[in-house]
Structure formats: C-alpha cells, structure tokens
C-alpha cells in the first residue's frame, strides 16, 4: 500500500460482471468483513501457488477500520482445489495494535519453502502513517504448505539502507523465482522507499531485492532513485512494483506511478542481470489507462504478459486484464482489454492455477459501493481473454511523423464539410490517437480547429479530448452541451508545486441545429479563446502552466478517454497546432480548408476515410 487513500466512491458504478466468455470465467468472494469475526476491512491481496499445488491467498486484515495505519494483521486462506473453495482464515502475523502488511510472498520451487516479506510500522489508530514513517521489513517462512509460519524476523540490516527512513514498502504482491538464465533459482521481490532529510522527503527509490540461498539472506539489487525538488515536484515515483520473468531470465518490473511530473500512471524498467541492476531508468507509459493504483503481472506462455489493473484513467473501477506482446513495452488499449468487472476495484494479484491448463487466478479488491468492500478470487482461461487482436480500423493522421489513428466502435462516414466526415452514434464510437511525444501541448500556445455537427437536445458530447480525466488532471477538451445551451471548452494546467487550476470558455448557444459549424480554440498571450464560425471570440485568462503533466494522456475524438461521455453527431477536419494561428490562418481554414504556412500541426485528421490499418 501507499500512504494515500483509495478513490472515493461518490458516484454509482455500472453493473458488475464480465461481459464476454462467462462460461470460461468464475469467481467468488474470499475476504469480506461480514464473513469474518474481528475485522472491519480486508485489503492488499497477494497470492501464490505452492509446490504441492495449494493456493495461498494473503491479505491485510484491518481490525478497526479500513485506514492504512491502524491495527492490521497479515492473514491467509488456503485452497486445495484450485481456488474453488477456501479453508477458514489463518493469522500469519498479528498487528497487536500496530500495522503489519504489504505481503510479498514467493515460493522456492527447489525446497518448497514459502517466504513472506512484509513491513511493520507503529499503528496510528487510523489514517495514514505520517512522514517520516518508520517502516521495517520482516521475513517469515513456512515449510508445511502454509499451515504454520515462523515468527517474523527483522531484516532491515539487509534490505533497508539507513537513509530509506521515511516510507518503505514491500510488494505488495507475489515475488518470483527465476526459472532460466544465469541466475536460475534466484528469488526476487520488489521494494519502494523514500528518504527524509531537512524536514521533508528528498528522494524516491524503486528497488529489487533478491536471495540466492532460498530466502535465508537477502540483498538489495537494482535501485532507481529520483530526487524531489524543494517545491515537492519530482519526475517519477515508481511504487508498488509488480515483477515478472521474461524469456532468458530478464526481470520485468511494472509499477504504479504516484504524482510524478512525467506523463502516465504506470512505468516500467527491465533488469538483464537477475535484478542486480536496471538496464535503464524507469519509463512512463502515458497511454496505459489506469488510476493511481497498484497493478499485478503474470506471464502467460513465452510471448504474452498480463497486467491486471482498473482501466479507468481517473477512478478505481473497471478491473481489466490487458495483454502485452512486446515484453511489457506496450499493453492493449482499454477498448481491447478483457473486463473482469465494472464495479469499483483496486489492488490485485495473479497466479497460474496448477494443473497445466493455463487457467489464471485473479485475486482483487472490488465492490458495488467501494473498491474496498471485499476481496474476490476469479478464475479464467486464455480462451476467455481471447487471442491477440489484429489491426483494427483506422483513419489517417496527416501530421508530420504521425501514424494512423485507431477507430473504435461503429464510427461511420458521413458527408463532411470538406469531403467526408466521421459519424458517431454514441454507442462507444471513438477515434483514438496512438501516443507520440509531439502530442502533449505542454505550457505553450496552441490552436484547435475542427468542424462539428449534431442535433441532439441533451447530454454532453465530446468533440476533442486531450490529456487526462478528472478535476485535477491536466487536460484540454471541447464539447457540446445542448441541455445547457452552449459549447464549452476547458483547460486544466499545473505550474510547479501549485495545485492544478482550470479555465473554461462557453459560447452563447449550443449550435445543435444539424448544420456544420467551425470551432476554433486558442491559447495565446495568457488567454484562452473560443469562437464558432468566425464570430467574436469568448476569451478568459488562461490557467497557468502545463496542460500535459502527471496524468494519463490520451487524444480522443467523439468520446472522453474513460468512454463515459460520447458524441452523437459528426466531426470533420480535426486539427491541433502547437502555436496560436492568426485570424487570417483560421479564416483560410474555415473558408477553404487551407493548411497554414509553416504547419506546426501535431495532429491533422481529415476523417475522409476509415479503413484497415494499424492501431
């Protein structure tokens, strides 16, 4: 866990349940407060399969409330039938008023011993452990298939340098034993920590720990450290790191990114020497949509790597399994993932079910009201996941260096303002641009130029969305709001260590008359301006700073990135420039579709054709 609360459940979730392949999917609740005496909440799942074929499901049993720094035990349930039934709860490490948690189990296949690395800190009665938080790593083991456990042993001398004195977390989820390569047999778990000095947190550390003697002794290996500026900003904070072995014994790490200025809520790194060092610093994955939350990994065969995490870019909901076919560099887009539930959902772990059938077990937090309501265990097959998807429909992006944009749903063609346009029926249609470094607009001037047509009388209809989702995420968007009688554009920006700020402009009228209208949105000279059909611009002071920081980043036409707002209407000639176009250039675009001299288009979508192509 991190010292941050779960996303609040202040709006209803959609109906729960996997929408496809139900026959190959089954699940049940294994931890919930009303099913167990003495606990108010269960969180932080971790699961492994022993050499005897037993599944061990660990969790934090929180006695008084669901807060992160209360009286918390590490608890366990075992399954002897591949997760179809579970024996009663066992106590592995008692909190006794303090916080014992962050379970990171790993199995030594040679000896059958199960190692469990955890952390301990003084209980606060509730809330979070304030910085500097004294958290100590401990080690336990079981030699009888998880039935009994050794007393926790303090291993700070091996795994916690003296200056990692603020936050320290193991896992929380399973570690791995390397099955190939030079370091075959090595046990590897993940750690993240912070340094506190001079009255503030000064550094973040993402690390791997390993053991070559069956877990008796441990040492720190790969470490990636990121400094924190005096204003509290930093580029990255790799946290709650999931590990998986790639072919050849390489160690792949995918982590939660927590509030760094680099774009994205996930980042990754790779070790080529069994976890002793990282080949390069962590790299963020801006268009891998998740909220800020822990996620889990499982390698399925030689070429498929699974990621389990909520797929909403802002909120903890819609648990999804996404596949990577390139060793974790990229994962499926959210519109191509396998939905486990549309309920609120949070932390998770995965395990390969014994028996050689390729069945995957997913242990995850979820609930109809809050992601912390219960912990479920799901079983699914690769048939339920589906095979690797081929290239989908696309539409050309004529901006320099751009590839085609993916077309999702049933986007159709319509008579456009210049040539053909794209028609959206509100049923999940959209156009999604693949991430390129040129797309984020940063703190500079920009211009959005597009044609829109719609005739509906209610709802919120996105024309273009660039950036993240939510009140604090940097973003730029423009949409029609016919029920409010307006077209509305918004920018949210952040500068230095200040809180995000927003500026919005609205038109007098929704222009929902079923005719084509030209829209121009410009950031220039410290102002945000919006005009329709060349009329007088509505202008307000801009929100200072960058519109491209910290959050996930996506560019979508016809839908919000979380697909919870959709356009019923049509778009044509959508262009974005990384400068402010002049009035004459905008007039030429509006009147003759003439490309401005000097270009500077970061995206240029004629929307004249939709056909086969890469996505």
Task: Specify the residue positions occupied by each region the protein language model found.
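Asp-box/BNR beta-propeller blade signature and adjacent active/binding-site loops
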Residues: 17-392
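Secretory targeting and sorting signals
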Residues: 1-11
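Extracellular glycan-associated modules
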Residues: 3, 393-615
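Polybasic, low-complexity, intrinsically disordered segments
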Residues: 11-20, 475, 486-488
